[in-house]
Amino acid sequence: MKAYSTICPGCGLGCGLYLLRDSEKGEGGERAATGKGMSILHRKQSAVNAGKLCKFGMQLPHFYSRERLRTAVGGKNVSEEEAVKEARERLTTFRREEIAFLAMPSTVTNEEALAFLSLVSEVGSENFSLGFERFFSVADFGILFRGMPLEEVERAEKVLLFFLDPFVQYPLLARRILRAKQRGAHVVDVSFAENERAKGIYDETILAEEIVGDFVKDMLSEGEDLGDVASAVARALVGGGEKLENSLILADLNLLSPTDFISAAIFLAEETKSQILFMKPFLNANGANLLSAAMNMRGRDIFEILNDVERGKIKCLFLLETDLLYDGGGVDGTALENLEFLVVQNAFKSAISEFADITICSEPLFLKKGTVVNVEGRVLSAGGDAQRTVEILERISGAERTYKQVQEEAWKHLGISKLNEYESFVAPASIASGKKRARKVTNKEKKGVGAEKSEEEARKDALTQLLWQKTSPFFWHAWQTTRRTKRSEAIVEISPSLARRLNLFKGEMLEIRRGGESRRVAFRIAEIPSYLMISTDKVTKDGILVRVEVEKAK
């Protein structure tokens, strides 16, 4: 039995734990990491979570039991050296504007991010993304990637949750809010619906429908999105007096967040003289993006890159530990048809690796040597000693630096002098100076909704709902399970009113349609507004709050 002191890759917190693994070696020796024969011990000395784990963290042995990716060229198993050589040679056959590089920083360490960015620089392409470039036009790095020790959440006198459900999205954050409440903090939830999980914790719930009802209603007919509603809510809250001043605002920043939503959250913080902490679903989102800032590499919006892939402008794609079919990219296999060359470097087989021309197997996080910077700004160790991912990237780029050289450069860029999870923090202000201010949140002219509607329009409206997807760690990973058994169907919460309108009975299914696609889902009844459906599963890939058509499944 071998023990690994590691961190969970489920979200941006990086909760500490021990993984116990059978000493028996599988196919490929120690590289054949598997969840079989693996168990978890709680690491009570962890600075982040004091040993507590959420549902995702408790099921990491299942997460690591996924099938390993084979190192192959054209579907044929080859040595790592052959695959690296072929990838390097093929990359040189494309013009730099035809090549794109994507890495969602979930299991990518700082050292790997630096090697990845060095490869991008060597190729000379501006087509790269770490997932968050779209938000750089909204505010400076110091706001977007500012960390805050979770102890400050516990010490806050006022906590405002801005369309964030910590009980679903970041359960270990919910524990900190509960402690703040026990210490006398006033906790306010700004949301679309009352949170049944938080009874007795929230002092006040401010419903969007109650203060900006017109915007919410217009989402059913005019195409408003979460950003529009959030902007209207922020304006209304700012005009509500001093009760929210000097709060700690908690909001989520992820690939699907509208830029207007982020602007609204920052505007609210500035106008109420409050602090703001953006939670993030990817473990090393702060570290990787601050590293790119320190290297003066800003990249492009991931969705712009994917559009260029679909249009055929980008012909070559390199994916580092990223599955676009699950990581929020909102693409399917048909979007990759115009690609001429696809390289996937990952630890596990994924849906998108099936399309790859070259696949290169790397190590799972718990075996890696390296560091990450979590949402607190805290520097954490991945816990292992494997250096292969860095070495592979260095060989593809031709730089061939040693791991130690790469680590020293990454630490220098981030201002890391030592690795101590209790004391080591990264300060964004020392990396990227703030030149941008949150965009002004302005009133949006309303078109109005006609009082009279045709029978066909009325029928359509009766089946039009807003789907609010609460993005738990399971949402962002190509793996989903209940406590003990896997399930394939998503579950949505619906109002009693919608159940009556659709004449639904227990055991029946819903069909949800959006953008020409449909999906069958299970349902459960909840006390939520009649216009709303809520899911903690991934039902659609193109938004957090989206308009859908719903009917009883045939």
Where are each of the predicted segments found?
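Glycine-rich phosphate/diphosphate-binding loops that line cofactor/substrate pockets in enzymes
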Residues: A83-A100, P149-E157, V233-L248, T272, ...
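A glycine-rich, hydrophobic/aromatic-adjacent loop/helix-cap motif
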Residues: S247-R311
